[in-house]
């Protein structure tokens, strides 16, 4: 399985995740199943980013694309999340941009020296205001630093996945809900068998494959947000 196929898998799971609240009432079997499958999207995007960071010919352009489309996607994201043009957290592309910066810090930690510590803390702090909290960067980092060992990738991802599940349980209890209200969050571990299927290849280097995800992300949020607002 090449990286483009993993991206399209992320697209499919993202659609299922975001359509769950349109098609089903919360806590129904259908809703839980779609949310569980939909959890593949974020770690799949993080995995693709880690591989993109390794293989891209121009990291500056890669980062610039992430930032530009993160800004473009923010209003569609806010509309999907709240039905208005404002939402207090940044969308997933901001999370990926922060993850990209974190990989840069790891790559240049010898040059940065002791500065790499406050920079890393600052990046992780920023992601507390974006989608997927600090877990997006941690997923990405685990995929990157263990890129030569799929078993370590799987183990580290599983550990971070259970940390994210624990955090989700804590948030649920803080909101007066049962700790298991979002147990479907454990679906993030479903990326593990997919990482074993990855063949190290990019896939077809067409402009369509290059730009599809960047365009799909804001458009699908806007469309689903409109559909949900009219139900």
Over which residues does each language-model region extend?
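Alpha-helical transmembrane segments and their immediate juxtamembrane cytosolic regions
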Residues: 1-231
